[in-house]
Design a protein with these regions (language model features):
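Catalytic Walker B motif of ABC-type/P-loop ATPase nucleotide-binding domains
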Residues: 174-177
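Helix-to-loop junction immediately C-terminal to a conserved catalytic motif
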Residues: 54
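Conserved ABC ATPase signature
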Residues: 149-153, 157
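Conserved ABC transporter NBD signature motif
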Residues: 62-78, 90
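Conserved ABC ATPase "signature" region
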Residues: 127-144
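Conserved catalytic motifs of ABC-family nucleotide-binding domains
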Residues: 170
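Conserved ABC ATPase "signature" C-loop
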Residues: 228-229
Length: 296
């Protein structure tokens, strides 16, 4: 499932004294099966952008194409009704996990929370429960958690349950808006590794909004930088992090691993690759030291 934005602009509170243009002529493609990361400083328009991907927001001008479906601003009541029907089905395939997603939990048990959306889309209770059991295991929680109140869980556990509720619809595209914010290190890594597993095993398209440059380097197939509602860069992580001027202009920092990598290069120590993970860096250093010893 490919998402394509053509000349998309969005204005909050249009035709009021509080009118504010947030997106300007966005042209962007989310490729099927890719892990796409969107970055930019606070207030740049990232969250507004992703809410166009499944019609939570409708472009003021321009169009959003999701496979064969075209989303444009409706001109009358009839078009609004028709669009609302199409968007309901679209949101089954393109799902969003928002910041502080644990605030979306509301049922008395974890099970009821996870099966709420599938039941509302006409999936049988038996199948919904089977999905819940599979998903709770996928996120690393015991099946006994299904009978617990979600409000008895830790922050990381609640975030995992919220993710299960999204995944229960079996979306083709999963959009995550700062999914690890305010979590401890272990919970952050568990969630990010889990999302990568979903992409690989279920061939799911992932869109991640983050301020964490380490995640950009480690996970992104493609990265888009948004600044003041416009696309400032689209390309590979290596291209982004090799352009110091671009990073500075968009208030982005190098990932920690690349800071060390460039310090090595300044000392004429070339490890021979652009590391995306600490393991790659340490393995390359070990191999370099080994070769040096063998040549002595």
């Amino acid at each position: 499932m490919q998402i394509n934005l053509k000349d998309v602009s969005y204005i909050y509170n249009e035709k009021t004294p509080y009118e504010k243009k947030v997106l300007t002529n966005i042209n962007l493609t989310i490729e099927e099966g890719h892990y796409t990361v969107i970055v930019g400083k606070t207030g740049s328009g990232k969250s507004t952008l992703i809410e166009h991907f499944n019609g939570l927001l409708i472009p003021t001008s321009g169009e959003v194409n999701v496979d064969e479906m075209v989303i444009v601003a409706p001109k009358n009541k009839k078009e609004r009704r028709e669009l609302a029907k199409k968007l309901r089905e679209l949101r089954k395939s393109v799902s969003v996990l928002f910041q502080f997603s644990e605030q979306q939990l509301f049922e008395t048990t974890v099970l009821k929370d996870i099966i709420f959306a599938p039941l509302n889309y006409g999936i049988s209770e038996e199948e919904a429960i089977e999905r819940a059991k599979e998903l709770i295991s996928l996120v690393g929680l015991d099946e006994s958690y299904l009978e617990k109140s979600p409000f008895e869980l830790s922050g990381g556990e609640m975030r995992k349950v919220a993710l299960c509720g999204i995944l229960a619809l079996e979306p083709k595209v999963l959009i995550l808006d700062e999914p690890t914010v305010a979590l401890d290190y272990r919970s952050r890594e568990e969630i990010m590794d889990m999302v990568k597993t979903l992409q690989k095993e279920k061939k799911m398209t992932i869109v991640l909004v983050t301020h964490n440059m380490d995640y950009v380097l480690k996970y992104a197939d493609i990265v888009h930088v948004i600044n003041s509602g416009e696309i400032a860069f689209s390309g590979l992580p290596e291209e982004l992090f090799s352009n110091k001027e671009l990073l500075k202009d968009n208030s982005l920092e190098l990932p920690k691993i690349l800071k060390f990598y460039y310090q090595l290069k300044e000392q004429n120590i070339d490890i021979g690759l652009f590391p995306r993970e600490y393991r790659e860096l340490t393995d390359s250093l070990k191999n370099m030291i080994k070769r040096k010893k063998e040549n002595e």
